[in-house]
Amino acid sequence: MILKADFLKLSANNLISWARQGSFWPLTFGLACCALEMMHATVSRYDFDRFGVIFRATPRQADLIIVAGTVTNKMAPALRRLYDQTADPKWVLSMGSCANGGGYYHYSYAVVKGCDKIIPVDMLCPRCPPTAEALFFGVLQLQKTLMKTINEKKVF
């Protein structure tokens, strides 16, 4: 009996991208109404855990920041600090109209006109507030985008 040595045809890049796209650990950063929908997305009906999405309370354990709600000028430095404390590789998902562009409070002097003015954003979930299904879809799209991006780059 002769064993062939080519039974493992998986590159290191594919292995790393597969592991990363299946284990998002988002930081809970809820600021307004969208935070309620983010909490709603964690119940058993949607079951984020089966996709490896486990919410974390500290930025050092997270690799995804979900900005859910209105970002005010006073909250902007805290958001930037949390982004800087999150370990690389990290991704940002902006959830809701207020986080995307100011939303209903766009013309207020105290509101940042989108969290992309403070930190780089990888995925946007529109609507006010987006449903749990929309957040679920956004996370799945981010996982697909991550798989494509890592396959294009060479890790080793």
Curated annotation (Swiss-Prot):
Annotated positions binding [4Fe-4S] cluster: 33-34, 98, 128
A molecular-function term among this protein's GO annotations: 4 iron, 4 sulfur cluster binding
Protein EC: 7.1.1.2
Signal peptide: none
Catalysed reaction, written as an equation: a ubiquinone + NADH + 5 H(+)(in) = a ubiquinol + NAD(+) + 4 H(+)(out)
Origin superkingdom: Eukaryota
Known cofactor(s): [4Fe-4S] cluster
GO CC terms of this entry: mitochondrion
Location(s), subcellular: Mitochondrion
Matching InterPro entries: NADH_UbQ_OxRdtase-like_20kDa (IPR006137), NADH_UQ_OxRdtase_20Kd_su (IPR006138)
UniProt remark on cofactor binding: Binds 1 [4Fe-4S] cluster.
Alphabetized UniProt keyword annotations: 4Fe-4S, Electron transport, Iron, Iron-sulfur, Metal-binding, Mitochondrion, NAD, Oxidoreductase, Respiratory chain, Translocase, Transport
Keyword Cytoplasm included in the entry's annotation: no
PANTHER family for this protein: NADH DEHYDROGENASE, NADH DEHYDROGENASE [UBIQUINONE] IRON-SULFUR PROTEIN 7, MITOCHONDRIAL
NCBIfam families: nuoB_fam, PRK06411.1
Family as reported in the entry's similarity comment: Belongs to the complex I 20 kDa subunit family.
Name recorded for this polypeptide: NADH-ubiquinone oxidoreductase 20 kDa subunit
Organism, scientific name: Paramecium tetraurelia
Higher taxonomy: Eukaryota, Sar, Alveolata, Ciliophora, Intramacronucleata
Gene: NAD10
